[in-house]
């Protein structure tokens, strides 16, 4: 998954968390790329709790040198589907099962992932 901030994603919805629970039991892995994870932390408590339990299967990464606009909004499940948001204002995008569209999404994610580092720790240590 990739998005500037995941503010418009329904990751905290009970149905989404239930689907992710079933999905992760198949020994799958998930990587999220974002400019900032603040909206996710504030709005998606269920997802945060789920991630705490499954942190070994979920990576959150960011590249502080990129601008928010450099992050595409997309979901890529290799070999299954690619979903790309083209216009967030009008909620318009493309869902595709075609390999060529998956490749375009992979290339967009690769551009972000190359210099990304781990971000959004599961727990924060304080003094």
Protein language model annotation of sequence segments:
Residues 1-32:
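PLD-like (HKD) phosphodiesterase/transphosphatidyltransferase domain
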Residues 8-9, 40-41, 83-84, 91:
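Short catalytic/ligand-binding loop motif for oxyanion handling, primarily in non-cytosolic enzymes
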Residues 33-78:
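HKD-type phospholipase D/PLD-like phosphodiesterase module
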Residues 59-106:
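HKD (HxKxxxxD) catalytic microenvironment of the phospholipase D
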Residues 108-127:
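Charged phosphate-binding loop/patch that engages nucleotide di/tri-phosphates or the phosphate backbone
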């Amino acid at each position: 998954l990739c998005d500037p901030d995941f503010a418009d994603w329904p990751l905290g919805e009970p149905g989404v968390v239930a689907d992710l629970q079933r999905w992760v039991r198949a020994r799958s892995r998930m990587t999220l790329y974002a400019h900032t994870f603040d909206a996710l932390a504030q709005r998606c408590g269920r997802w945060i709790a789920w991630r705490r339990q499954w942190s070994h299967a979920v990576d959150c990464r960011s590249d502080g040198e990129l601008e928010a606009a450099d992050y595409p909004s997309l979901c890529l499940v290799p070999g299954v589907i690619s979903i790309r948001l083209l216009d967030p204002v009008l909620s318009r995008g493309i869902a595709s099962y075609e390999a060529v569209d998956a490749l375009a999404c992979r290339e967009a994610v690769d551009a972000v992932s190359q210099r990304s580092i781990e971000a959004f720790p599961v727990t924060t240590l304080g003094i």
